[in-house]
Swiss-Prot record:
GO terms for cellular component: plasma membrane. This is Glycerol-3-phosphate acyltransferase 1. Its EC number is 2.3.1.275. It is a multi-pass membrane protein. It is found in: Cell membrane. The chain crosses the membrane at residues 5-25, 52-72, 81-101, 111-131, 138-158. PANTHER family: GLYCEROL-3-PHOSPHATE ACYLTRANSFERASE-RELATED, INNER MEMBRANE PROTEIN YGIH. It comes from Deinococcus radiodurans (strain ATCC 13939 / DSM 20539 / JCM 16871 / CCUG 27074 / LMG 4051 / NBRC 15346 / NCIMB 9279 / VKM B-1422 / R1). Pathway: Lipid metabolism; phospholipid metabolism.
Amino acid sequence: MTLTALLALLLSYLIGAIPAAAWLARARGVDIRKVGSGNSGATNVLRSLGKGPALLVASFDILKGVLAVLLARALGLSAEWAALCGVLAVIGHNFSPFLAFRGGKGVATSFGVIAILDPVLGLTTFVLAIACMWLTRFVSAGSIMGAFIAGALVLVLPRPTWDRAAVLFLAALLVWQHRENIRKLQAGTERRLGEKVS
């Protein structure tokens, strides 16, 4: 591993670790970790603060994934390192040192990574995940479905091995991060889209 690659990985992790949801909520006088699901992500911001702040957070979180991959490319690193930098950004988002190694579930940041690695895969996954979310009214169901769609498509599309490995890892991590949501969906206690925190 070269010093450049090591620097890119570290910077990617730190970019991903920027807790946009937590910091924006704090500026509004809210501790996002103590309301709703306690998750530092756009969905919890939507329920706690509304559409505008949620859109800002989602956009920033997507950008984190995009920037990590572009950083590796700008530094002249290979496609393998670019994919790994994307993964590190999502890990940073999910396990941020700024939030005692807690964070979000990585949906938006994973989308940013996948979209920059393979725009067709990213767009297809996004459209189908949004459709699932709209039909079920569950954000978590759309996110989980998106993970399965991305994982399935990357296995059949002609993609480099490292891109394929990165997408499969991100899909598996996203499903794991939603394990509590899966339990709530099974129990019928998951909040639907549009429900405010009590």
